């Protein structure tokens, strides 16, 4: 009997220890599960925050990045050496790296010009584009030196046909012809008039315009054109890499010419020892801002940037 009591007492003691061990194990498992859940939540929260931050950064980059980039020199024309009149500013832009295309229609894109020192600020001066003009409509636009001038060139490469204007003056002639036909049909005055023969006397309707000349070598003969501008405006045209004939969209790899023509008001200012700012705001991305400090015009056409 004594042995049986001892055995029972021993078994009872061991049973209690077993239960105590089981309780401890359950509590430990509970802690492990809780810790795992908290770790899972923390990791997922961390991933969520990381993804959210990444999304915010990407969105910020998308907003901050410009869809267009300056792709050439900035030129400025004046009546050198008198330096009493300004005529135009010209430069080229291209879609930025990683941008597939940019729409450059005057209805979706704005161009502004500012010269704070002179108290000059013009907004939304972008009025016309030659990107939408069919090259076939310009075949008989300008007659000079016994022939029709080929204003626009076409080049085919890898099955694509690219159109471009050889220089800004050819684009000016094309713009003049296009606007003349448009305004002739609508009975409203064109903002630009170009004449290839010297006028014996300037008509009354041109006397207040800002005027300048340019000369082209056409089949060995120099032909001088008189340009009259009655309002400040900007226009664009294809310079290279534009296969989208008839569309205002500038695809990746293309080069687009931008020309700001000064009317009589802005033409009376000559910019020197000051900064001029041009801003292009397309329908995507942030504006392209071009700020150039002009020391002093060094010729009829000066490189200012």
From Swiss-Prot:
Flagellin is the subunit protein which polymerizes to form the filaments of archaeal flagella. The keyword Membrane does not apply. Residues 1-18 form a propeptide. Its main location: other. Belongs to the archaeal flagellin family. It is found in: Archaeal flagellum. Flagellar filament preparations contain two major bands with molecular weights of 31 and 33 kDa and several minor higher molecular weight bands; both major bands have an identical N-terminal sequence. InterPro entries: Flagellin/pilin_N_arc (IPR013373), Flagellin_arc (IPR002774). This is Flagellin FlaB2. Keywords: Archaeal flagellum, Glycoprotein. Coiled coil: none annotated. GO terms for cellular component: archaeal-type flagellum. Pfam families: Arch_flagellin (PF01917). One of its GO terms (molecular function) is structural molecule activity. Glycosylated. GO terms for biological process: archaeal or bacterial-type flagellum-dependent cell motility. It comes from Saccharolobus shibatae (strain ATCC 51178 / DSM 5389 / JCM 8931 / NBRC 15437 / B12).
